[in-house]
């Protein structure tokens, strides 16, 4: 009996050690991926210059490329400079850059041949579970579509699109109502008007709208918003939606929509 108990105890100990070893390896693997992802972005940090911090923070900004559209309040906006030539030497799939003040969102945007590849690959094309920020493959890379969508993971270390979660609070929206979208040809302000939790069955990721359908979609988005905005988009506007995971229920998503201006 004693021998049987010893064997049982030994077996349980072995199983426990195996579980602990696997858990430790899993934690190490996740942290290694996080580190590799963060290092990759550090390696390209010299390819974008952000505005200097001042006593009274200004909205994020970038020097406009030649021919960039003039914005009504551009004097209040300092546009960062992005070296797209250097970035595209790393990966020609890079189509834009997005920056949101008050978050860690300061990333290149890529576009693949589908919406799966960059879920598990960095902007460089290197495999990594953190993925990267990417434009829906159905969209025009120039953001000329009526509705463009960019995706990013909700990461435990606060990177990728975790920061858009903060728009669930009115106060954060009030302080950060605008994102900056920089492309090789034009700079855009993304003026947010709605943010809401969606299910995979929702039409939050619909691309092909008639004008009438788009008007209804815009109103529905505003009605569901976690925050109140004075912006009232119309059917002739171009909309950019930022999409990430959320955790209110299984397969929840948080989407943040803004007008391109």
Task: State each model region's role.
Residues 20-261:
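Solvent-exposed, non-transmembrane regions of membrane-associated and secreted proteins
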Residues 1-16:
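N-terminal Sec-pathway targeting helices
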């Amino acid at each position: 009996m004693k021998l049987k108990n010893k064997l049982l105890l030994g077996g349980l100990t072995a199983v426990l050690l195996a579980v602990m070893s696997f858990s430790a390896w899993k934690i190490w693997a996740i942290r290694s991926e996080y580190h590799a992802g963060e290092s990759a972005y550090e390696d390209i940090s010299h390819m974008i210059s952000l505005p200097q911090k001042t006593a009274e923070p200004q909205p994020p900004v970038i020097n406009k490329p030649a021919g960039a559209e003039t914005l009504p309040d551009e004097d209040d906006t300092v546009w960062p400079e992005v070296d797209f030539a250097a970035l595209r030497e790393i990966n020609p799939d890079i189509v834009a850059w997005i920056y949101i003040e008050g978050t860690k969102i300061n990333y290149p945007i890529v576009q693949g041949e589908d919406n799966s590849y960059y879920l598990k690959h960095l902007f460089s094309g290197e495999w990594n579970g953190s993925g990267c920020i990417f434009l829906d493959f159905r969209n025009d890379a120039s953001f000329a579509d009526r509705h463009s969508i960019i995706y990013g993971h909700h990461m435990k270390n606060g990177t990728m699109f975790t920061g858009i979660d903060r728009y669930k609070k009115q106060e954060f929206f009030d302080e950060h109502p605008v994102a900056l979208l920089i492309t090789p040809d034009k700079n855009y302000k993304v003026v947010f008007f709605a943010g809401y939790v969606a299910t995979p069955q929702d039409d939050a990721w619909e691309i092909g709208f008639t004008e009438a359908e788009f008007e209804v979609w815009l109103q529905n988005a505003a009605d569901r918003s976690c925050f109140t905005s004075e912006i009232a988009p119309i059917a002739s506007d171009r909309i950019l939606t930022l999409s990430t995971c959320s955790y209110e229920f299984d397969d929840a998503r948080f989407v943040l929509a803004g007008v391109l201006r």
